[in-house]
Structures are given as structure tokens and as C-alpha cells.
Swiss-Prot record:
Family stated for the protein in its record: Belongs to the TAF9 family.
Entry protein name: SAGA complex/transcription factor TFIID complex subunit Taf9
A Gene Ontology cellular-component term: cytosol
Protein's UniProt keywords contain Phosphoprotein: yes
Keywords: Nucleus, Phosphoprotein, Transcription, Transcription regulation
One biological process term in Gene Ontology: transcription initiation-coupled chromatin remodeling
A GO MF label: RNA polymerase II general transcription initiation factor activity
Gene that produces this protein: taf9
Subcellular location(s) of the protein: Nucleus
InterPro entries linked: Histone-fold, TFIID-31, TFIID_subunit_9
Ranges where the record places region Disordered: 131-163
Length: 163
């Protein structure tokens, strides 16, 4: 993190990076990541490049091919960038008007029941739809020492409920 009170000699790097550090410290920014000056330089480079390209287009349109860029071309490019890229928030009155229009429509009434409405239970898939019955246990008395316990398990009847 960088701190305020940075002198020009204490910052290592290109002149532009030192300039960004000095601007941030003069604005009273107490601390920032070391990537912030690089991001600001990238933004400034892209913005300047776009202004020069737009100025060149305006110069070629007004004075022909390979015309030099004039101050008026740069001013026009800056004005178009400000109108296009840097838009402010809408006016407060406009937002209040939109809010009043939206709030005119009443909210739906709250139903006496809460949650999701489910269909009747017989149509819901939340209930089991099968019955397990063991015919051998119902018809015969239990044997305590049965060696064929697996055979009895195989006789379980899985039938589907019919309603």
C-alpha cells in the first residue's frame, strides 16, 4: 500500500507512474493497491488513443485524406466522448416521476394461506405409492431359528396401490 506524502524521488518506475502516485497523494488518497496506478495509466492510454483516432476521423472528414489533426478536431472528439462515454445519473425529478408511476399500481393481495399451493394429496408425488407385505409372516407362525431367512425376504410382495 502506498501512503500520502510520497516524494518524487521515492517512487520507482516510469515518469507517468510517479505522476499518478503524486496525483493520488495530492488528492488525499491515504492508501491504495499498487495496481491502481497501472489501471489508471491503462485507462488514460485507451482514452487518449480513442481521442486521437476520433480526431483523425473528424480531420479526414472535414479536410480530406491525410489531413493534420487540429485543435478543433480534438475538441470535437473530447465533446463526443464526454457525451457518449461519461453520462451522469438521470435527474432526481425524472427518477421520482418513474417511482410515482411504478407505485401507482397496487401490490397483489396477500392470500390467507402461505407458501405454495399444492394439488390434493392423491395427485402429489410426495406419498409412497407401494405397499410392502410379507405373506409368509402373515400366514405362518414365526420360526425362531430359520436357516432360510433369505428365502423369506425374497417372498416380499411389492404391489402398487390402486385408488
Amino acid at each position: 500500500m502506498s501512503s500520502p506524502g510520497i516524494s518524487d524521488e521515492s517512487i520507482k518506475g516510469p515518469k507517468d507512474v510517479r505522476l499518478i502516485h503524486l496525483i493520488l497523494s495530492s488528492l488525499g488518497v491515504p492508501s491504495y493497491s499498487q495496481t491502481v496506478p497501472l489501471q489508471l495509466l491503462t485507462f488514460a492510454h485507451r482514452y487518449t488513443q480513442q481521442l486521437i483516432q476520433d480526431s483523425q476521423v473528424y480531420a479526414e472528414h472535414s479536410r480530406g485524406q491525410n489531413a493534420p489533426i487540429s485543435v478543433e478536431d480534438v475538441r470535437l472528439a473530447v465533446a463526443s466522448q464526454i457525451n457518449h462515454s461519461f453520462t451522469g445519473p438521470p435527474p432526481k425529478e425524472f427518477l421520482l416521476e418513474l417511482a410515482m408511476e411504478r407505485n401507482r399500481k397496487p401490490l397483489p393481495q396477500i392470500q390467507p394461506s402461505y407458501g405454495f399451493r399444492l394439488p390434493p394429496e392423491k395427485y402429489c408425488l410426495t406419498q409412497p405409492n407401494w405397499i410392502v407385505s410379507n405373506e409368509t409372516q402373515q400366514n405362518q407362525p414365526k420360526e425362531e431359528n430359520s436357516s432360510d431367512s433369505r428365502m423369506e425376504e425374497d417372498k416380499l410382495d411389492f404391489s402398487v396401490k390402486s385408488e
